[in-house]
Amino acid sequence: MSLLALGINHKTAPVSLRERVTFSPDTLDRAIESLLRQPSVQAGVVLSTCNRTELYLSVEQRADLRQQIVDWLCSYHQLTPEEVSDSLYWHQDNEAVSHLMRVASGLDSLVLGEPQILGQVKKAFSESQREQALSADLERLFQKTFSVAKRVRTETEIGTSAVSVAFAACTLARQIFESLARLNVLLVGAGETIELVARHLHQHQVQHMMIANRTRERAQSLADEVGAEVIPLADIDARLADADIVISSTASPLPIIGKGMVERALKARRNRPMLLVDIAVPRDIEPEVGDLANAYLYSVDDLHAIIQGNMAQRQEAAVQAEHIVQQECANFMAWLRAQGAVDTIREYRAQAEQRRAEAESEALAALAQGVEAEAVIRRLAHRLTNRLIHAPTKSLQQAAGSGDAQRLQMLRDSLGLDHN
């Protein structure tokens, strides 16, 4: 068995490709079921966010393993291998373990140290738990990863500064507008990212916010917290002209705001400028909106420069975090390798127990026949010693006879002969 990590992320692929490789939450269960039908896949976790899509797998080794997994990914998303081959990365065993730990700790994020990714990894893990798609080694890996991420947060300052995609979106708005307090803001969606955006804006005294969401209940809870108005998604067209700033992050597979909708809004606004920030993957706002005069459209990739400006203070903490990940990765791999000896140890113990039971039975029979106890004990000790050292003695003789000094030393080490 082997552990694998396969995926694409913001470093290897543009949003135009990433949005084609995302797994919808509504169909994730079917995706996992389909993945587990692949001959070599024994267990799997699918992590799909706006910045990355990754498969973490426990697999049986085979010559065509990589091609098999890539073919499945392409077939599922109706892509050709040529479209994704240059953007895919592939990690195995030690590298896969290290990669997952780095991802969950925020070390591989667009925003170094951002905390949201850990919750997303936990959610992906829980989904595989529900689908009974985990093996013992994969489950142990994720549980270990969660403790590593917690240790990174506790022992370093990687998460102390308020840097995130949500924060970057708000920073962009503050750079374009002198003051946000009197502006009207439309937030589309009510997930974790929009929650963070809403709280950032609320902290900057934004007084007029609208939240458009598919389900009113989730949006209402957030609206009550930040003093916003809730509107249905269907009302966006009618209310868009009221918005100076639009920030969107939903899980919709198709754009929610189109070029024509924005054109009508700009006309109603008498061409007063509108900032639109699309931090969804797949995109919520048609990219052609960026061609309109007075419409300033930014995608999640455009936020990268802003984010980089807030990174310096996290770099030192990241070095500490990397040391923790390396240490914990080595610990996990040692545990994983030890699992390979479990069956051998079990057999060895069973064999020793059988020989002990045989010697004990012979001793009890001798006592029952009236043989003196002292003689029985001496014979028991002698026979048990001979039986237990018989196999190691033969191995030592064979190693010495063949001149295999390395094997001879290994046997000496395993028998503890150099520790007395």
Swiss-Prot record:
It comes from the Bacteria. Catalyzes the NADPH-dependent reduction of glutamyl-tRNA(Glu) to glutamate 1-semialdehyde (GSA). Possesses an unusual extended V-shaped dimeric structure with each monomer consisting of three distinct domains arranged along a curved 'spinal' alpha-helix. The N-terminal catalytic domain specifically recognizes the glutamate moiety of the substrate. The second domain is the NADPH-binding domain, and the third C-terminal domain is responsible for dimerization. GO terms for biological process: protoporphyrinogen IX biosynthetic process from glutamate. The keyword Thylakoid does not apply. GO terms for molecular function: glutamyl-tRNA reductase activity; NADP binding. PROSITE patterns: GLUTR (PS00747). NADP(+) binds at G189, A190, G191, E192, T193, I194. Keywords: NADP, Oxidoreductase, Porphyrin biosynthesis. Substrate binds at T49, C50, N51, R52, S109, E114, P115, Q116, Q120. It catalyses: (S)-4-amino-5-oxopentanoate + tRNA(Glu) + NADP(+) = L-glutamyl-tRNA(Glu) + NADPH + H(+). Its EC number is 1.2.1.70. Homodimer. Coiled coil: none annotated. This is Glutamyl-tRNA reductase. Pathway: Porphyrin-containing compound metabolism; protoporphyrin-IX biosynthesis; 5-aminolevulinate from L-glutamyl-tRNA(Glu): step 1/2. The gene is hemA. Belongs to the glutamyl-tRNA reductase family. The active site is at C50 (nucleophile).
